């Protein structure tokens, strides 16, 4: 009997408000890729602010009452807290009231919408989040969370691990630009970094063998005539679109990459490059005029 050989499957689906792509190398690669995208939808049902029964929606409407959530949601919350601390508050998942006030109330792919309680407010710290040993979580009254980009990044990390545990030899999970990759060798796969100003322009190509790469821009919640001009905020207002408008960060996970893109965009460019360099991260920033600024370590991932 001839042993089955590995094949490569690439399957895509719209979920989490973005195009999700699972690329899997292995035996039964197509079936595994489909299962990966099924898992995207399962995680979306836990974390979407547009689904009233999701863990995130239930926490946001609990008015401070302890709420039982999935173990994966507990992991998400721990990542949120760690990212908020590491980025000195640049990543802040409590800014949903600002997004809603700016008009970001509806899903970009269906007719679902988000409504918040009248007391919803932005918090400058996350120390009030209580995570109990029995799997319950309590948010301070008025705090609302948005899984957003870090949710997509963490979902990509979860699903990459799922694929590897189920026989994949190599996998790339790409959830709208938040990518978790393990090629199973040192060669790596090429990732094209597109301009946030013109998606038809490739700014650079990086090669990743293991880890995460995330690209974020101010315009991520804007599609055609829908959405808002800038979806990233400081604690009081939308970020000025005349400064950094997009960033790509390479790290050891998609979730961590995604969190640091927020820091990169919301910070002074020179300060961002210094901090990212000192943190050991490779990054590229894009300004409003299309100019790119890169950390010194960026070139270790390119073909130059």
Regions inferred by a protein language model and the residue ranges of each:
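Mature catalytic core of soluble alpha/beta enzymes
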Residues: 1-304
């Amino acid at each position: 009997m001839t042993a089955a050989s590995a094949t490569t499957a690439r399957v895509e689906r719209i979920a989490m408000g973005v195009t999700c792509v699972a690329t899997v190398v292995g035996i039964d690669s197509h079936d595994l890729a489909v299962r990966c995208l099924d898992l995207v939808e399962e995680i979306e049902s836990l974390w979407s602010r547009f689904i009233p029964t999701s863990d995130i929606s239930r926490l946001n409407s609990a008015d401070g009452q302890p709420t039982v959530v999935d173990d994966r949601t507990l992991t998400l919350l721990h990542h949120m807290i760690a990212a908020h601390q590491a980025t000195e508050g640049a990543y802040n998942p409590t800014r949903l009231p600002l997004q809603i006030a700016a008009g970001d109330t509806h899903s970009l792919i269906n007719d679902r919408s988000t409504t918040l309680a009248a007391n919803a407010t932005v918090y400058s710290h996350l120390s009030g989040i209580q995570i109990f040993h029995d799997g319950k979580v309590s948010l301070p009254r008025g705090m609302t969370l948005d899984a957003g980009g870090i949710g997509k990044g963490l979902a990509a990390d979860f699903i990459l691990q799922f694929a590897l545990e189920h026989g994949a030899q190599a996998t790339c999970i790409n959830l709208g630009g938040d990518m978790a990759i393990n090629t199973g060798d040192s060669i790596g796969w090429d990732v094209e970094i597109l301009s946030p100003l013109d998606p038809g322009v490739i700014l650079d190509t990086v090669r990743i063998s293991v880890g995460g790469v995330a690209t974020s821009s101010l315009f991520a919640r804007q599609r055609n005539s829908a959405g808002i001009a800038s979806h990233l905020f400081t604690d009081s207002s939308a970020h000025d679109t005349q400064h950094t408008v997009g960033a790509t960060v390479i790290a050891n996970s998609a979730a961590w990459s995604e969190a640091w893109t927020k820091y990169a965009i919301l910070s002074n460019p020179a300060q961002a490059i210094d901090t990212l360099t000192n943190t050991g991260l490779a990054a590229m920033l894009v300004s409003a005029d299309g100019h790119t600024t890169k950390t010194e370590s960026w070139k270790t991932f390119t073909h130059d």
